[in-house]
Regions:
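Helix-start (N-cap) detector for alpha-helical repeat units in TPR-like alpha-solenoids
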Residues: 22-23, 55-56, 87-90, 121, ...
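Canonical positions in the second alpha-helix
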Residues: 47-48, 80-81, 113, 177-178, ...
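Structural marker of alpha-solenoid helical repeat scaffolds
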Residues: 50-51, 82-84, 116, 181, ...
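Canonical tetratricopeptide repeat
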Residues: 60, 92, 126-128, 191, ...
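Terminal, low-structured helical/coil segments at or just beyond the last alpha-helical repeat
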Residues: 125-161, 368-400
């Protein structure tokens, strides 16, 4: 497993030279920054820039320099991004000058960003810790006195907030007002789909979003919501296509790979699922979630040896997590390796004794090892924890 992960990491780092898709090394760069390795992220983007002068590479390298505290280099890269795509680096420049407590310059660049296609939402700006030093500055107060957002944008933000807090009735009221006043606005269409999803009307949401994306094919928010609605409606094939569209838009979000892998697993495209997960593991080699998903995908395809390699790596990395032992125990259980299954269920129960399913499966494993008395102890534990499936085994093996 270690050899696999080393190869994956190496192949992602050298992806530029191999001429593969840029979204994967953008994801890698983001992962390196998140993992506290901004220097490695900057080096990766430097290699990318040798192959192609792309604004997204400059922007990500600027973020890496910012994370290192190298503000001068970050400013240079944000300005380089601006030269390739006007205004693309203005928000980053605003953040740097805010961190430096230079309110006039920070607000100047923020206003340039707000007048461009790269404008951030009010929530994004207000929750960005970079601007915390400006909160009591007059320039900051003056900035927020201006009308930066349209009525549909404000209404959409209110709808998002009310849905997030469970106030669906108020979200519906705001949407009805919005739709009557601005029926053709893209924010109205998105809000309509958002309300439909909150009401579990997934087909309505999918229909609305498909119509909107026909006109605005690169709208990231709509694509993300479409993928979620497709998954919720039981259409993993459609969702995988939506996640692919997001990835091909160079959205530097590694979680898209995990979401797409989950869809591939549901459609039986196991190799595609494992490919996505292994790419993700190249970014986050110790991810419990990814190792678990990779093992389950391999197990579903009938490759138990491959599954066990992932599950064992997860146990090694996360020895105090009961779910890692359960994953491996389930794999042993499916392959009828009863002794190993019983051992791993036992390890999980040492960490989480309230898992009735683990008690039941450990009991079944022990029965198959001929240890009926020990098995009955486990069946009773499962029953006492509310597992009704244990009654069949209790009556068959334990009641004389």
């Amino acid at each position: 497993m270690k050899r696999i992960l080393i190869y994956i990491t190496f192949s992602v780092i050298t992806v530029v030279a191999a001429g593969q898709k840029p979204e994967y090394y953008l994801m890698k760069g983001k992962a390196l920054i998140e993992s506290g390795k901004p220097g490695d992220a900057a080096a990766l983007m430097t290699e990318a820039l040798k192959e192609k002068q792309d604004a997204t590479f400059y922007l990500l390298r600027a973020e890496a320099f910012l994370a290192k505290g190298d503000y001068s280099s970050a400013i240079d890269d944000f300005n380089s991004a601006n030269k390739l795509i006007p205004s693309s680096g203005e928000y980053g420049l605003a953040r740097i000058y805010a961190i430096r407590n230079d309110a006039p310059t920070a607000v100047y660049h923020l206003e340039l960003s707000m007048r461009s296609a790269f404008r951030k939402s009010e929530k994004e700006i207000l929750t960005d810790p970079s601007f915390s030093l400006l909160e009591n500055r007059p320039e900051w107060r003056q900035f927020w006195k201006k009308e930066w957002y349209t009525t549909p944008e404000k209404s959409m933000a209110e709808i998002e907030y009310n849905i997030s807090t469970g106030n669906l009735a108020e979200a519906g009221n705001i949407f009805r007002t919005l739709s009557s006043a601005y029926p053709e606005d893209v924010n109205t269409a998105y809000s309509s789909a958002l309300v439909s999803v909150s009401e579990s009307k997934y087909s309505d949401a999918v229909k609305m979003l498909a119509q909107t994306l026909a006109e605005f094919p690169d709208n990231e928010k709509c694509l993300r919501l479409l993928a979620s609605a497709q998954e919720a409606s039981g259409n993993p094939a459609g969702a995988s296509l939506s996640y692919t569209r997001l990835i091909e838009l160079n959205v530097p979000d590694p979680e898209l790979l995990i979401r797409r892998a989950g869809c591939y697993s549901k459609t039986g495209e196991t190799e595609k699922a494992v490919d996505d997960i292994e790419t993700y593991l190249g970014f986050y080699p110790e991810s419990k979630k990814a190792l678990s998903l990779a093992g389950k995908a391999a197990s579903a395809s009938g490759d138990n040896i491959r599954a066990l390699s992932y599950f064992s790596e997860n146990v090694r990395l996360h020895p105090n997590d009961p779910e890692c032992f359960i994953d491996r125990a389930n794999s042993y259980f499916m392959s009828r390796s009863w002794e190993w299954a019983a051992r791993d269920y036992g390890m999980s129960l040492d960490l989480q004794p309230g898992n009735s399913e683990a008690w039941l499966n450990k009991g079944i494993s022990l029965v198959n090892l001929g240890k009926t008395e020990d098995a009955c102890f486990n069946f009773r534990k499962a029953f006492n924890l509310g597992n009704r499936n244990s009654t069949e085994y209790l009556s068959r093996y334990c009641i004389k």
